Regions:
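Cytochrome P450 fold signature focused on the C-terminal beta-domain
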Residues: 159, 252-269, 325-345, 358-387, ...
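Cytochrome P450 heme-binding "Cys pocket" and the immediately downstream C-terminal segment
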Residues: 28, 151, 187, 318-321, ...
Length: 509
């Protein structure tokens, strides 16, 4: 009885501190968020946390307390304060859930490390290979995957007249494309060729993301689940993908598999970096495998999701679809479509940017930790006064909130309207350029600053090349125009059930 009384007294004292004395006590937000992360955990596990974040900011304003020590911000002005190259805000322990264990030791990944200096060291040797100038050397690899993709759509859906879940097939395309540029071959027989999952990789990826997103809201849970030293209780591992990467590494280093020096892939680049590095740099075989895994596990989902969003919104807005078709027809682009030609298509560019804006790939907070000097959030309070967040506060912004800011994107920010990226009637050149720059600066679809997505240009490269190919070759229509797609937010906002009919398209003379 005495023990129970002690526990209740301690719990009451702890709750009283968080309600009356915690440094964040004056930050508005749900009542439960003052005491526990449970609501945050359950909401994220439900798979649509981005909607909750929008509602919370609509109700409470630009600064919202969503957990005892976690604050969500929505003012675009905060982007440069938290995420710029000059800002020294490390990632939070949310990302620690992404760590792996090797030999009982925790190993941080390029994506998950909370050490900005370590991240810069790990990223520096490889980042140049993700620039457009280097991607152009890989263009023929993406071309052959696109040709295979179009061929499979023709064979499996156009000729037999069967409906196609295009979200699923965009995922197959994205995985095969990233596999080809990484190690010159698809994984096993290839997702497009099989027309389905391989070794449960796609299923495993979904389950791992479900775990990462939810458990990351209460990172201490990961210590007793996935990182449990006695018995691991976590999502399925990516062992099949890791094994494939290891086999490719061994085959390439032993000479069992060779690659033309004039036709290099990412594995060639990674091995060259390892060979040229000083042993003190710590670039090992495990580092190379980690780089390969980062490519294939992080490089496919966002590409596939964006492609699905592009087609879905075009089919929901027939006028936009027709306008894009007319632009591409008039451009008379060669087949396969060169990247340099595609990015010069003005309306195509507007469509891609708008799809990324209304459906960013990541749907949770990009969490950071406030450094020792604290953070003054300008005009964060309802009365327009600044709000001070003390050191150690977990703070972040959600692209699904920021990308819909009406002050930046207009009063119709929640509407898919590619024309907002074009110069308006009567709009001066200088005003247009300033407006576009402002929108680009605020877009958080790929993150921002020093931790911006490494593969951003690679993803866009694959997107800009495939969209004009399929829009030019086929006519798409939704099987049910009234049906909404299925979304699940588990870090990446993945898409399912976008059923379309595909017909061959007769190009105008």
């Amino acid at each position: 009885m005495a023990l129970l009384t002690l526990v209740l007294v301690l719990a009451a004292t702890f709750a009283a501190y968080r309600y009356f004395f915690h440094p964040l006590r004056r930050i508005p937000g749900p009542l439960l968020a003052k005491f526990t992360d449970a609501q945050r955990f359950l909401d994220t596990a439900g798979g649509r946390a981005e909607l909750t974040h929008r509602l919370l900011h609509a109700k409470y304003g630009p600064v919202v307390r969503i957990g005892p020590n976690t604050v969500s911000l929505s003012d675009p002005e905060c982007i440069k304060l938290i995420y710029s190259n000059k800002a020294n805000f490390p990632k939070s322990d949310f990302y620690a859930v992404n760590d792996v264990t090797q030999g009982g030791q925790r190993v941080c990944t390029l994506f998950g490390t909370r050490d900005n200096a370590f991240h810069a060291k790990l990223r520096a040797p490889i980042q140049k290979y993700y620039k457009v100038s280097e991607l152009l050397k890989l263009e023929h690899r993406v071309d052959r995957v696109i040709e295979d993709f179009c061929g499979k759509l023709e064979e499996r859906f156009v000729k037999p007249g069967k409906p196609c879940d295009i979200a699923e097939w965009f995922l197959f395309y994205a995985w095969d494309a990233i596999s080809d540029v990484t190690f010159s071959k698809p994984i096993k027989e290839g997702f497009l060729n099989k027309g389905g999952d391989i070794d449960d990789l796609l299923t495993t990826a979904e389950q791992a993301l479900d775990y990462f997103a939810a458990v990351g809201q209460v990172p201490i849970l990961d210590e007793v689940l996935d990182k449990n030293p006695v018995k691991r209780i976590g999502p399925p591992s990516f062992q099949a993908a890791a094994d494939f990467c290891v086999k490719k590494l061994i085959a390439r280093t032993t000479g069992a598999e060779t690659n033309d020096t004039a036709n290099q892939d990412y594995l060639d680049h990674f091995l060259a970096i390892k060979q040229a590095s000083d042993p003190a740099d710590g670039v090992s075989d495990a580092t190379v495998v980690g780089w390969m895994l980062l490519n294939i596990l992080a490089g496919a989902d966002t590409t596939a999701t964006t492609l699905t969003a592009i087609l879905y919104y075009l089919l929901k807005h027939p006028d936009c679809y027709k306008r894009l078709q007319h632009e591409l027809d008039a451009a008379r682009l060669p087949r396969p479509v060169p990247y340099g030609d595609a990015v010069r298509c003005e309306y195509l560019d507007a469509v891609v940017r708008e799809a990324l804006r209304v459906h960013p790939g990541v749907g949770l907070l990009l969490e950071r930790v406030v450094p020792e000097e604290g953070l003054a959030v300008p005009r964060g309070a309802r009365n327009g006064e600044d709000v001070f967040l003390p050191p150690g506060t977990v703070v972040g912004m959600n692209a699904w909130v920021v990308n819909n800011d009406k002050g930046v994107f207009g009063p119709d920010a929640e509407v898919f309207r590619p024309e907002r990226w074009l110069r308006g009637d009567g709009e001066g050149v200088e005003g247009y350029e300033e407006r576009i720059k402002r929108m680009k600066d605020v877009m958080l679809s790929f993150g921002a600053g020093r931790r911006v997505c490494l593969g951003r240009e690679l993803s866009l490269f694959e997107i800009y090349k495939v969209v004009p190919m399929i829009v030019g070759a086929f006519d798409f229509e939704l099987v049910d125009q009234k049906k909404e797609w299925e979304l699940t937010n588990s870090w990446f906002v993945r898409v399912k059930s976008v059923d379309v009919r595909i017909k061959p398209r007769m190009l105008p003379n």
